[in-house]
Amino acid sequence: MTESVRLPVARLKPSTVALPGSKSISNRTLLLAALSDNACEIHSLLKSDDTDRMLEALDKLGVQIEYLAEDRLKVHGTGGRFPNRTADLFLGNAGTAFRPLTAALAVLGGDYHLHGVPRMHERPIGDLVDALRIAGADVEYLGKEHYPPLHIGERQDNGERVIPIKGNVSSQFLTALLMALPLTGQAFEIRMVGELISKPYIDITLKLMAQFGVQVINEGYRVFKIPADAHYHAPEHLHVEGDASSASYFLAAGLIAATPVRVTGIGANSIQGDVAFARELEKIGADVVWGENFVEVSRPKERAVQSFDLDANHIPDAAMTLAIVALATGQTCTLRNIGSWRVKETDRIAAMANELRKLGAKVVEEAEAIHITPPETLTPDAVIDTYDDHRMAMCFSLVSLLGVPVVINDPKCTHKTFPTYFDVFSSLTETAE
């Protein structure tokens, strides 16, 4: 039987939340540190299913890792060559581990088997594999063409130095290629084919690579130039920012409940694109205060939450939270340019539409957009399915701030990025039933 949690009608208390470390930054940092020519102590690392899969994989590849505290460890770099050239790697449903490791191992060569949970085998990887093959990599599909699981063999340097890659399905493919190609020591040019989605995630990658000593020239997100003789050299200490996507639930709560909520671990200078979520809240009625290491959202009770029609390509993960905020507006709201939702942990457009309808909302689903019209009164005690998707569970917790209780199935799916989410959420609220 599916485990579930019932959230009663809740009242938000003025609150401060210390965010867990960013998933995107944590897994990129672990891989870059493992490929560096020195040791790196990483602080505030996210403890979650996705980072556990990356750490397990690095261990199987022969990387020495010292666990110093719950959220602090030291990675001893391998100088850009993993000691173990044969490994069977199970990577769960962790795209931030699967895609970058695929590219790094394909560029280095060896005898590797990469696989995950059934949903991971439904998430496309063909655009990345096509690019890696142009660079001489030996990557074989073990099941359906263009999807994991994969076998990786020895790379043959074919002299090709200009690599085209599509960027309209997932920016993680470009991230993976950017992080892997410096391991060759050769100069490369990566050329985008068609539109590149989720550019802020590429900014995270480029900024982290620079912190590890590799400067990539970005020519308008169309061409990326990797210098010859590049190698990774880690900072002695690196602090992982709080997760800006996870911040979205608490910031949205502050707007919905007209109660001040401060999140710490991100701020005005964050390298994560999802901090722009707070700016979107500002446009629809929030008061936002920015600090160096915090963002605070509130709303005067007399000011209504405004409806919106938003191109959300720049904040694909945090935009899911806006689908719940739409219920507080009383008017039709639209999220556009969210086609990447279809190939995430689940088909998030379909999942979001299904579950919003259980609350009484009218939802029109398009290939790359969703239109949400809230009902006069939300349906109480709706049972929300979460599709093994951490963000579905966290988003729908906010319904309890809208005057109705809600039941969330499989709340433990938040272990992917935020294992303590429901404990933290309940600590910020009091029952109003």
Curated annotation (Swiss-Prot):
<feature type="binding site">
    <location>
        <position position="171"/>
    </location>
    <ligand>
        <name>3-phosphoshikimate</name>
    </ligand>
</feature>
<feature type="binding site">
    <location>
        <position position="317"/>
    </location>
    <ligand>
        <name>3-phosphoshikimate</name>
    </ligand>
</feature>
<feature type="binding site">
    <location>
        <position position="28"/>
    </location>
    <ligand>
        <name>3-phosphoshikimate</name>
    </ligand>
</feature>
<dbReference type="InterPro" id="IPR006264">
    <property type="entry name" value="EPSP_synthase"/>
</dbReference>
<dbReference type="InterPro" id="IPR013792">
    <property type="entry name" value="RNA3'P_cycl/enolpyr_Trfase_a/b"/>
</dbReference>
<comment type="subunit">
    <text>Monomer.</text>
</comment>
<dbReference type="GO" id="GO:0003866">
    <property type="term" value="F:3-phosphoshikimate 1-carboxyvinyltransferase activity"/>
</dbReference>
<feature type="binding site">
    <location>
        <position position="172"/>
    </location>
    <ligand>
        <name>3-phosphoshikimate</name>
    </ligand>
</feature>
<keyword id="KW-0028">Amino-acid biosynthesis</keyword>
<feature type="binding site">
    <location>
        <position position="23"/>
    </location>
    <ligand>
        <name>3-phosphoshikimate</name>
    </ligand>
</feature>
<dbReference type="InterPro" id="IPR001986">
    <property type="entry name" value="Enolpyruvate_Tfrase_dom"/>
</dbReference>
<feature type="binding site">
    <location>
        <position position="198"/>
    </location>
    <ligand>
        <name>3-phosphoshikimate</name>
    </ligand>
</feature>
<keyword id="KW-0057">Aromatic amino acid biosynthesis</keyword>
<dbReference type="GO" id="GO:0009423">
    <property type="term" value="P:chorismate biosynthetic process"/>
</dbReference>
<dbReference type="GO" id="GO:0005737">
    <property type="term" value="C:cytoplasm"/>
</dbReference>
<feature type="binding site">
    <location>
        <position position="170"/>
    </location>
    <ligand>
        <name>3-phosphoshikimate</name>
    </ligand>
</feature>
<feature type="active site" description="Proton acceptor">
    <location>
        <position position="317"/>
    </location>
</feature>
<protein>
    <recommendedName>
        <fullName>3-phosphoshikimate 1-carboxyvinyltransferase</fullName>
        <ecNumber>2.5.1.19</ecNumber>
    </recommendedName>
</protein>
<dbReference type="InterPro" id="IPR036968">
    <property type="entry name" value="Enolpyruvate_Tfrase_sf"/>
</dbReference>
<feature type="binding site">
    <location>
        <position position="172"/>
    </location>
    <ligand>
        <name>phosphoenolpyruvate</name>
    </ligand>
</feature>
<dbReference type="Pfam" id="PF00275">
    <property type="entry name" value="EPSP_synthase"/>
</dbReference>
<dbReference type="GO" id="GO:0008652">
    <property type="term" value="P:amino acid biosynthetic process"/>
</dbReference>
<feature type="binding site">
    <location>
        <position position="348"/>
    </location>
    <ligand>
        <name>phosphoenolpyruvate</name>
    </ligand>
</feature>
<feature type="binding site">
    <location>
        <position position="24"/>
    </location>
    <ligand>
        <name>3-phosphoshikimate</name>
    </ligand>
</feature>
<feature type="binding site">
    <location>
        <position position="344"/>
    </location>
    <ligand>
        <name>3-phosphoshikimate</name>
    </ligand>
</feature>
<comment type="function">
    <text>Catalyzes the transfer of the enolpyruvyl moiety of phosphoenolpyruvate (PEP) to the 5-hydroxyl of shikimate-3-phosphate (S3P) to produce enolpyruvyl shikimate-3-phosphate and inorganic phosphate.</text>
</comment>
<comment type="pathway">
    <text>Metabolic intermediate biosynthesis; chorismate biosynthesis; chorismate from D-erythrose 4-phosphate and phosphoenolpyruvate: step 6/7.</text>
</comment>
<feature type="binding site">
    <location>
        <position position="95"/>
    </location>
    <ligand>
        <name>phosphoenolpyruvate</name>
    </ligand>
</feature>
<dbReference type="GO" id="GO:0009073">
    <property type="term" value="P:aromatic amino acid family biosynthetic process"/>
</dbReference>
<feature type="binding site">
    <location>
        <position position="123"/>
    </location>
    <ligand>
        <name>phosphoenolpyruvate</name>
    </ligand>
</feature>
<comment type="similarity">
    <text>Belongs to the EPSP synthase family.</text>
</comment>
<feature type="binding site">
    <location>
        <position position="416"/>
    </location>
    <ligand>
        <name>phosphoenolpyruvate</name>
    </ligand>
</feature>
<feature type="binding site">
    <location>
        <position position="23"/>
    </location>
    <ligand>
        <name>phosphoenolpyruvate</name>
    </ligand>
</feature>
<keyword id="KW-0963">Cytoplasm</keyword>
<dbReference type="InterPro" id="IPR023193">
    <property type="entry name" value="EPSP_synthase_CS"/>
</dbReference>
<keyword id="KW-0808">Transferase</keyword>
<feature type="binding site">
    <location>
        <position position="391"/>
    </location>
    <ligand>
        <name>phosphoenolpyruvate</name>
    </ligand>
</feature>
